[in-house]
Regions:
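Alpha/beta enzyme core
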Residues: 1-37, 54-60
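Hydrophobic faces of well-ordered beta-strands that scaffold small-molecule active sites
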Residues: 8-12, 39-43, 65-67
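Conserved, mostly hydrophobic/aromatic
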Residues: 10, 61, 84, 177
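Glycine-rich phosphate-binding active-site loops on the catalytic face of alpha/beta enzymes
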Residues: 12, 60-77
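Active-site beta-loop-alpha junctions enriched in small/polar residues
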Residues: 13-17, 42-48, 70
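Aromatic/hydrophobic pocket-lining residues that form the small-molecule binding cavity
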Residues: 24, 50, 103
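C-terminal helical cap(s) of enzyme catalytic domains, especially alpha/beta-barrels
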Residues: 73-99
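A mid-to-C-terminal "edge-of-domain" accessory segment
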Residues: 92-223
Length: 223
């Protein structure tokens, strides 16, 4: 094939998604050394390593990465395009021209077309990526997010958010009161609000909506 093709590039394909990053690096170097041709890498995510193996391939000299937006693809999906983009840009210092703030719009459109929802905790795209429930260091969420997060929320068109739930503390309640324009509260009221917030969070096994918190505030103030 090399002699009679001849190919423009060589694709290394991990169809079953079972190659380790170390194995992929070895294969890229070996094939590149043997052929002298550009290398393309195509992986699947059966072991959750699709992005890791493609990043490893790039460090070994691969010039082309195959990916799918939202990590879609057969079975467990292909390497997630948005994760590769941010990884190459932020972790490996590649100078790219990508408009990262457009990723949420693209992801939402594709999710609707494919009828596959985006998990709240999905890297890069998840709605919960920049949420802080614990009361520890919540001031950084809004004012210095890189203290708390691996990427700045604004890079991908998002913002930090404080939510209330079973792990919240008084500081979170105070912050939420201010954010929603609900004024201040006495210490005993704060303690009661926090108790009720935790009760609701435990009961629903999720964080509270602003409407649920408003109901708690009104109930506590009403006595």
């Amino acid at each position: 094939v090399l002699n009679e093709g001849p190919p423009d590039s060589i694709g290394i394909v991990d169809t079953m998604g079972c190659a380790t990053p170390e194995a992929i690096k070895y294969m890229v170097r070996w094939v590149k050394g043997m052929t002298g041709l550009p290398i393309e890498i195509h992986t699947h995510n059966d072991f959750g390593m699709g992005v890791a193996t493609e990043l490893a391939a790039v460090t070994a000299g691969a010039e082309v990465v195959h990916s799918c937006a939202n990590g879609l693809g057969e079975r467990t999906g292909n390497a997630a395009m948005e994760e590769l983009m941010l990884g190459l840009h932020l972790l490996y210092g590649y100078d790219t021209n990508y408009k990262f703030d457009k990723l949420p719009e693209l992801a939402a459109m594709l999710s609707a077309i494919a009828n596959i929802p985006i998990a709240r905790n999905k890297p890069v795209l998840g709605s919960g990526n920049f949420i802080r429930e614990s009361g520890i260091a919540i001031q950084y969420v809004m004012h210095d997010p890189l203290v708390m997060f691996g990427t700045h929320p604004a890079l991908t068109g998002k913002s930090g958010e404080v939510m209330l739930g079973k792990k919240s503390g008084k500081a979170s309640v105070v912050y939420k009161l201010g954010e929603l324009g609900l004024g201040e509260a006495e210490d005993d009221q704060l303690a009661e609000m926090l108790t009720r917030v935790k009760q609701v969070g435990i009961a629903k096994r999720d964080m509270l909506s602003d409407a649920e918190f408003r109901e708690i505030v009104d109930a506590v103030r009403a006595g």
